[in-house]
């Protein structure tokens, strides 16, 4: 059994917030000294890392309703100039889903017959019954997104749309631009 470190020293907590992120920890949990954990209650506060990055919209999945954007797929250019998938945005209001689809329709990649090009994604243990196919977009739309952490070349969790960036060129959205947490050995975080 391992216990997480704890402190009442704000300076030390701030240091841990930065230092331990590289071990894969999302952030810090704060609570009153006399507060016990109660399942289903929200008496503790979790402070997570938040960053922003500019990414290229590379495709979208149609919402389960059959229209509108279900999720917007994102990519970044690697050092070899390849546009690689890095994650997606899926939290849109119904109105935004429909408006976004209208905006994206002219950007659809089309095959020789004029049909939209589909991006097939292998099914995983989480999505075995869902159609994971997406419609490919011309890599021209840049969006600024908020994220908490990048693991390898993927956003660790779903990201949030901050704004569209018509002032940015898609080719300027590089994987190397994304801030990463310095590596840290998790065994240094846990105590016996």
Locate predicted features:
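Catalytic cores of nucleic-acid ligases and guanylyltransferases
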Residues: 1-192
């Amino acid at each position: 059994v391992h216990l997480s470190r704890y402190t009442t020293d704000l300076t030390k907590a701030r240091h841990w917030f930065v230092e331990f992120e590289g071990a894969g920890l999302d952030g810090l949990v704060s609570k009153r000294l006399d507060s016990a954990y109660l399942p289903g209650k929200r008496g503790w506060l979790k402070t997570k890392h938040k960053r922003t990055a500019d990414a290229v919209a590379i495709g979208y999945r149609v919402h389960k309703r059959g229209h509108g954007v279900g999720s917007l797929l994102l990519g970044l250019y690697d050092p070899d100039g390849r546009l690689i998938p890095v994650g997606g945005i899926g939290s849109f209001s119904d109105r935004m889903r429909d408006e976004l689809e209208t905006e994206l329709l002219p950007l659809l990649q089309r095959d020789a017959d004029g049909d939209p090009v589909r991006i097939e994604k292998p099914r995983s243990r989480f999505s075995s019954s869902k159609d994971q196919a997406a419609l490919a977009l011309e890599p021209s739309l840049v969006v600024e997104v908020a994220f908490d952490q990048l693991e390898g070349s993927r956003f660790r969790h779903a990201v949030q749309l901050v704004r569209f960036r018509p002032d940015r060129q898609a080719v300027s959205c590089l994987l190397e631009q994304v801030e990463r947490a310095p590596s840290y050995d998790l065994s240094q975080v846990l105590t016996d």
